From Swiss-Prot:
Keywords: Oxidoreductase
Superkingdom of the organism of origin: Bacteria
The encoding gene: gcvPA
Enzyme Commission identifier(s): 1.4.4.2
Full protein name: Probable glycine dehydrogenase (decarboxylating) subunit 1
Function, as annotated: The glycine cleavage system catalyzes the degradation of glycine. The P protein binds the alpha-amino group of glycine through its pyridoxal phosphate cofactor; CO(2) is released and the remaining methylamine moiety is then transferred to the lipoamide cofactor of the H protein.
Pfam families: GDC-P
Family statement: Belongs to the GcvP family. N-terminal subunit subfamily.
Length: 442
């Protein structure tokens, strides 16, 4: 709607309708000292001058080379992602409730669900969630519904922000959350096994984990199932070009953040979360599912189905109260996957792995620096420094290098640990520069 200011006649009519003589009389109850008479705002400016001012502000930003990950990653986004997702047919906050006029969006999201299932090795996916952290919380609540139990065991190597979101969702619901500290950046298998009881609904792990370590979760899945619990796996989608799928490891519910699939960092959002499971649990999936059907003429079509949200059914029977729509971000994820293709995703994952391995070897050879463990990694790894990692990272930032994520703020006793991330966008020269600056800072 265009902005249409009130005319003097509009103002007179409104004042007459409420029985007030003037605008001043309307605001008379507010003490004069509290009423603003003027505002410290500049006069209007031309478009050309405004652009000049904005460019000057942008010029004050310090360019840095980023080796920061921890959940959100600096991946290349093909131009086709912006081009297609920006088309008027897709670029909308509208939820496709009317299938007769939303077939394009519905089919695109149906293909998204298919892609997520193939990526994770699962059988069904919904049409997206808010982000990776809330997707993990939704998976936890789903496990509670499926099993009828009220206890969760979560590994300490799961992203600390995601763990906090799970606690926020569940703390006041009478759910017992047992957190098992990681051991040297890896899941403590004996402790996880010992924590399982006949009240445990699920075991929650992340792969690759927050430290960057990649583990085979198959044995943990078997142990969980033997105790009647589910395995929830949080994954990094790009890594699945190389890493064994969570479905193949025996996971019952798989979640993750889709930011790395064609969505920019953009100060932390927006993004989308994905969730996938087996057909057995399809009616417990939160959010919306796009289904394939036929119309009255026998033609193939797509519709929203199994919308077990509180807007559609009785609140106490709803699987979630998800309302806002992340479909545009999920669409970007689908376009990204379609543009790189199956073989391209493998190549992309291998490029991330290879560059990280080069960086790992280079940084690990610096005097006083060692790796947290010898487990395989994808594009993140944790190094142990002879100094406080936060102080070292701050010093390198002054040199134009965002060196990684210091762990002291998230894990007790790990003040000297730094998680370094190397995506396909980092060059050999940039990695060499990181090693040089790090060595100089020690």
């Amino acid at each position: 709607m265009s902005y249409c200011p009130n005319t003097p006649e509009d103002i007179r009519e409104m004042l007459a309708a409420i029985g007030v003589a003037s605008v001043d009389a309307l605001f008379a109850p507010i003490p004069a000292g509290l009423r603003a008479r003027s505002f410290a705002l500049p006069d209007g400016t031309s478009e050309q001058e405004l652009l000049r001012q904005m460019k000057q502000l942008a010029g004050t930003d310090r360019p840095v080379t980023g080796f920061i990950g921890g959940g959100y990653y600096d991946h290349y986004i093909p131009a086709v992602v912006d081009h297609l997702s920006g088309r008027a047919e897709f670029y909308t906050a509208y939820t496709p409730y009317q299938p007769e006029c939303s077939q394009g969006t519905l089919q695109a999201l149906f293909e998204y669900q298919t892609a997520i299932c193939r990526l994770t090795g699962m059988e069904v996916s919904n049409a997206s969630l808010y982000d990776g952290g809330t997707a993990l919380a939704e998976a936890a609540m789903m496990a509670l519904r499926v099993t009828g139990r009220n206890r969760l065991v979560i590994d300490g190597s799961v992203n600390p922000f995601s763990r906090e979101i799970v606690r926020t969702y569940l703390t006041n619901l009478g759910v017992e959350i047992v957190e098992i500290p990681a051991r040297d950046g890896l899941a403590d298998r004996p402790a996880l096994t010992a924590a399982l009881t006949d009240l445990t609904a699920a075991v929650i792990l992340q792969n690759p984990n927050f430290f960057g370590s990649v583990e085979d979760l198959s044995d943990i899945a078997l142990t969980a199932h033997a105790n009647g619990a589910l395995l929830i796996a949080s994954v990094y989608p790009i890594s699945l070009g190389l890493v064994k799928s969570p479905g193949a490891m025996g996971a019952d519910i798989v979640v993750g953040d889709g930011q790395s699939l064609g969505n920019p960092l953009s100060f932390g959002g927006p993004s989308f979360g994905f969730i996938a499971t087996t057909k057995k649990y399809i009616r417990n999936l939160p959010g919306r599912i796009i289904g394939e059907t036929v119309d009255k003429s026998g033609r193939r079509g797509f519709v929203l189905t199994l919308q077990a949200r509180e807007q559609h059914i009785k609140r106490h029977k709803a699987t979630s109260n998800i309302c806002s729509n992340q479909s545009l971000c999920a669409l970007r994820g689908m376009i990204f996957l379609a543009s790189v293709g199956k073989e391209g995703l493998v190549d992309l994952a291998r490029l991330n792995r290879d560059k990280a391995e080069y960086a790992k070897g280079l940084l690990g050879s610096i005097k006083g620096v060692k790796l947290l463990n010898t487990a395989p990694t994808f594009n993140e790894f944790t190094i142990v420094l002879p100094k406080d990692a936060a102080e070292v990272a701050e010093r390198l930032l002054g040199k134009g290098v965002a060196a990684g994520v210091p762990l002291g703020a998230y894990y007790h006793g790990m003040d000297n640990c730094l998680v370094v991330t190397v995506t396909e966008k980092r060059t050999r020269d940039e990695i060499d520069a990181l090693a040089k600056e790090l060595e100089g800072a020690l």
